[in-house]
Amino acid sequence: PNKATIIYHHGTNENPPEMSFNKILAGKGTAVPANLIFVRAPFNSSLRAFVASIAQARNYAAMLATSAVLIEGLVRRCREQGQGPILISGISLGGFVANLHHTYFNSADAYAPLLAGPLIEDVFLNSVYRKLVAAPDAEAEGRITRALSFAAEYAAVSHHNLFPLLARHDQYIRYDVQRAAYGPNVPVAVLEKGHVTGALAHDALRAHLLAVLNAGLKQTT
C-alpha cells in the first residue's frame, strides 16, 4: 500500500492507445517501481473519431476536462485505499491533461507532463498543427483561446511539484513558448529532439519519470 502510483494518460491518437504507456512504463524489462494506472480519453478510438472531435473546440475542451476529472477520481480512490505517493504523467495530449489536473486539482504529489506545456491553444493557433484547424479569423481564434486556455488559472497555482519535459526542436509543442509559459521557477528537462523523435525516446522518457519518482516525490512529500 505504500508503493508509489503513476497515473499515465496517452497521447493523441496512439494506436493502440496504450502504446507509449507500454513502451515507457509497462513493457517487458521496464521494471518501474510503482503501481501503474492507464487512462484513455474520449474520442480516441480512431483517427477519424479524433479528427471529428477537434472540429469543435468545445468537444476538445470536454475531452480534456473529462480526462482530468477521471484522474481526480483515481487520485481520491488511491488516497482512500492508503496508497503511497502519486505521480501524474502523460505524453503530448496526456501531458496537457496532466497540466490541467495540476492547475485545477493539484491533488497529486508530483506531475511530470511529457512533451506538453501550459498553453494548449498555441498548438492549434501557432504551430504546424494549425493547418488542421479551421480558424480563418481573429474571432474564431478567440473562441479557441477561450475554450482551451487555462493560463490565468495555472499562474495562480504553486508549482513545487511540477517536473515537465519538453523537446527543444518540437514543431507542435513549441519549446520557447511552452518553456516560458511554465515560468522561471519550474525545472524543465529538455530532450534535443523533435516531437515524434522525442515521443520515441522511450528510455529517456522513462529515465525522467524515474528521476521524478526518486527525487521529485521525496521533495513534495
Residue ranges and their predicted role:
Residues R76-Y129:
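Primarily recognizes the serine-hydrolase "nucleophile elbow" in alpha/beta-hydrolase
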Residues S45-V51, I120-F124:
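Short acidic/His/Gly/Ser-rich catalytic and metal-binding motifs that mark active-site loops
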Residues Y8, I88, P113, P164-L166:
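Structural beta-sheet core signal
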